[in-house]
């Protein structure tokens, strides 16, 4: 490593942004091929390229931060700002779905029967699986906070236990959501109700899967003693993201499942 007189991380040339862009092209093109020609070859290639890119890019970042010492306090401060801006962008992303839902539900058109839910739609009971899902995510918020406090106190065993419980609850939530989709009496093609319901809850479910993956990586890293009480931004970012997913679900539950039904 060349000598430098500043605390900033000058990133070395990397192929992963290019392969990541290629995987995005393959996945979007693959989705179009799947929808129109029932061919999943391009989509599978895109997913494989994306998984390989994620693994190798994360490997490089872990090497730079944990073993090479590139992530100084100034670099970590910049990463924190970046994560905050990313979460803010996600807030606006989900705001669009809530806007679409309330635009359609507060003033139902004659085509919908002048009522909400639209005529012929039988919404899910908010006091059954959706309420259980809410309890699961709230419990996962408690366990991730426990894991964070345990890490700050240097209690590795409790940190791993809290993280494992959070991951298990995240997987359980995903399975419950999948069963709910399977048993729903309406589909994404059933007008504006079906489209707003499945797009909003579906993207939230995708974020739960992403967050669970994020936490699994943190769990595997902690098994290798990568985190300390003073150097653990990877885990902190995962915890922020998970709390954001929790809050979005509360808004989804109150708006779409409870009020919208």
UniProtKB/Swiss-Prot annotation:
Residue spans, topological domain Mitochondrial matrix: 1-15, 67-72, 153-155, 224-232
Enzyme type, top EC level: translocase
Signal peptide: none
Subcellular location: Mitochondrion inner membrane
Reactions this protein catalyses: 4 Fe(II)-[cytochrome c] + O2 + 8 H(+)(in) = 4 Fe(III)-[cytochrome c] + 2 H2O + 4 H(+)(out)
Membrane topology: Multi-pass membrane protein
Transmembrane segments: 16-34, 41-66, 73-105, 129-152, 156-183, 191-223, 233-256
Record bears the keyword Mitochondrion: yes
Predominant location category: mitochondrion
Record topology, Mitochondrial intermembrane segments: 35-40, 106-128, 184-190, 257-261
This enzyme's EC code(s): 7.1.1.9
Family that this chain belongs to: Belongs to the cytochrome c oxidase subunit 3 family.
Assembly description: Component of the cytochrome c oxidase (complex IV, CIV), a multisubunit enzyme composed of 14 subunits. The complex is composed of a catalytic core of 3 subunits MT-CO1, MT-CO2 and MT-CO3, encoded in the mitochondrial DNA, and 11 supernumerary subunits COX4I, COX5A, COX5B, COX6A, COX6B, COX6C, COX7A, COX7B, COX7C, COX8 and NDUFA4, which are encoded in the nuclear genome.
Stated role: Component of the cytochrome c oxidase, the last enzyme in the mitochondrial electron transport chain which drives oxidative phosphorylation. The respiratory chain contains 3 multisubunit complexes succinate dehydrogenase (complex II, CII), ubiquinol-cytochrome c oxidoreductase (cytochrome b-c1 complex, complex III, CIII) and cytochrome c oxidase (complex IV, CIV), that cooperate to transfer electrons derived from NADH and succinate to molecular oxygen, creating an electrochemical gradient over the inner membrane that drives transmembrane transport and the ATP synthase.
Protein's recorded name: Cytochrome c oxidase subunit 3
């Amino acid at each position: 490593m060349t000598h430098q007189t500043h605390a900033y991380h000058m990133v070395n040339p990397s192929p992963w942004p290019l392969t990541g862009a290629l995987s995005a092209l393959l996945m979007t093109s693959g989705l179009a091929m799947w929808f129109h020609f029932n061919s999943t070859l391009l989509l599978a290639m895109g997913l494989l390229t994306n998984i390989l890119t994620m693994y190798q890019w994360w490997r490089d970042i872990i090497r730079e931060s944990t073993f090479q010492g590139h992530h100084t306090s100034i670099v970590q401060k910049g990463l924190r700002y970046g994560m905050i801006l990313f979460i803010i962008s996600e807030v606006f992303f989900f705001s669009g779905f809530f806007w679409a839902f309330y635009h359609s539900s507060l003033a139902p058109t004659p085509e919908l029967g002048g009522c909400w839910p639209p005529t012929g739609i039988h919404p899910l009971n908010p006091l059954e699986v959706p309420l259980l899902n809410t309890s699961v995510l709230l419990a996962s918020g408690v366990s991730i906070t426990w894991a964070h406090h345990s890490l700050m106190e240097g209690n590795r065993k409790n940190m791993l236990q809290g993280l494992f419980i959070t991951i298990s609850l995240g997987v359980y939530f995903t399975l419950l959501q999948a069963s709910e989709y399977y048993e729903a009496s309406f589909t994404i093609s059933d007008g504006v109700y079906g489209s707003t319901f499945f797009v909003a809850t579906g993207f939230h479910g995708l974020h739960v899967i992403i967050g669970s993956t994020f936490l699994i990586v943190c769990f595997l890293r902690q098994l290798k003693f990568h985190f300390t009480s003073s150097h653990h931004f990877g885990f902190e970012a995962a915890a922020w993201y998970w709390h954001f997913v929790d809050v979005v679900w509360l808004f989804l539950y109150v708006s779409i499942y409870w009020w919208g039904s």
